[in-house]
Structures are given as C-alpha cells and as structure tokens.
C-alpha cells in the first residue's frame, strides 16, 4: 500500500526549488540529500524517480531541490506531485500506543457506551496535536483529539477506536 509522505505545493523562485507539504512524521529521514523519492503526478499520472539534491525548512514546509529540476518551468510541471513510500517498507512501531496513520484510517469509531459514531477518514497532524477526522454515516465530519483522555482504546485486531467524548464533541448542530 502506497503512503504519501509529501506533496509539491508549488515552485519557489526561478532555480527549480519546490515547496513541499510534509506528510510524514520523520521528514529528517525521508527528505535528505541523496535520498531517492518515488513521485506520482496528480490525478493518477505516471510515476517517476527523483533524487534529493538539497533540502531546507520553509515556514512549516520544506524547500526541496531535486536532481534534474533546474528551473521554474520544470518545477511548475511537478505541482501536485505526491512522494510515496510502500507501507511494507516502514519499520515496525515499538511503542504500544503509537500507530501509523494508515493503520487507523478506516477503523470503526465507537463511544465507550457502545454507540457507533463513524469511521476514521484520516489523521490530521496539527501544531496542537493529532486529530482523528471521523466521517459519520450521514457524511458529516467530527474532529476528535487523539489523546488518551478522549481515545482510551484502539484495537487494530478488532478494527475499533473507542472514544469517551466530552460533552458537546459529537454535537453536529
């Protein structure tokens, strides 16, 4: 299963640098000079291999220079490209209460009282911490802080995320 670790937001300057939105918790290991990246063009386009020439932080994103991308025109052509890794290549997680995003996505969300709320659509990484974006059967989105006080139990074996929501968290009105 392919996992997105970054996405090209736009070109930066005239020398081929790219502004990359990071979608991995370990950018220092994935986006380093000499690293090989697998990229896929937007809307199911062709895959292509890239080699990182340089990288530097840029306001919560990265400025990336790739081998063979030497000017703004080449950089603009990569807008929307996503960088991928295969989930089988990820190291196992040693901590019992830590998960890869893809392990949580699709799990059933149920309250401690046994009420089904919906399914985890995605995990959002914010400055304040992680949020579970839960899609209800009606199609609404509920954002659940992914903290032990609200999410006391995750069972990958049972395909279940159990939540103990504070008053008002599940109110959609």
Swiss-Prot record:
Q: Does the keyword Chaperone apply?
A: yes
User: Does the record carry Chaperone as a key word?
Assistant: yes
Which key words are in the record?
A: Chaperone, Cytoplasm, Ribosome biogenesis, rRNA processing
Please provide an example of a Pfam family that matches this protein in its UniProt record. Answer: RimM
Where does the PRC barrel domain lie?
96-169
Q: Where is this protein found?
A: Cytoplasm
Tell me the Gene Ontology biological-process terms attached to this UniProt entry.
ribosomal small subunit biogenesis; rRNA processing
Which Gene Ontology cellular-component terms appear in the entry? Answer: cytoplasm; ribosome
Q: Which GO terms describe its molecular function?
A: ribosome binding
Q: What is its main location?
A: cytoplasm
**Which family is this protein grouped under?**
Belongs to the RimM family.
Can you state the subunit structure given in the record? Binds ribosomal protein uS19.
Which HAMAP family does this one have? Answer: Ribosome_mat_RimM
Domain writeup: The PRC barrel domain binds ribosomal protein uS19.
Function noted in UniProt: An accessory protein needed during the final step in the assembly of 30S ribosomal subunit, possibly for assembly of the head region. Essential for efficient processing of 16S rRNA. May be needed both before and after RbfA during the maturation of 16S rRNA. It has affinity for free ribosomal 30S subunits but not for 70S ribosomes.
Q: What is this protein called?
A: Ribosome maturation factor RimM
- Origin species, per record, is Mycobacterium sp. (strain KMS)
Give the gene name: rimM
């Amino acid at each position: 299963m392919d996992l997105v670790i970054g996405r090209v937001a736009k070109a930066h300057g005239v020398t081929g640098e790219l502004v990359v939105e990071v979608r991995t918790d370990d950018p220092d290991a994935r986006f380093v000079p000499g690293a090989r990246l697998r990229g896929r063009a937007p809307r199911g386009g062709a895959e292509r291999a890239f080699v990182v020439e340089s990288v530097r932080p840029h306001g919560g994103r990265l400025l990336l220079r790739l081998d063979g991308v030497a000017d703004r025109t080449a950089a603009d052509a990569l807008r929307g490209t996503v960088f991928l890794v295969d989930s089988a290549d990820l190291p196992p997680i040693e901590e019992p209460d830590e998960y890869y995003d893809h392990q949580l996505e699709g799990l059933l969300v149920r309250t401690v009282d046994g009420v089904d709320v919906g399914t985890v659509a995605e995990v959002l990484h914010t400055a304040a911490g992680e949020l579970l974006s839960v899609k209800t059967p009606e199609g609404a989105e509920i954002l659940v802080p992914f903290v032990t006080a609200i999410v006391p139990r995750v069972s990958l074996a049972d395909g279940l995320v159990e939540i103990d929501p504070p008053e008002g968290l599940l109110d959609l009105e």
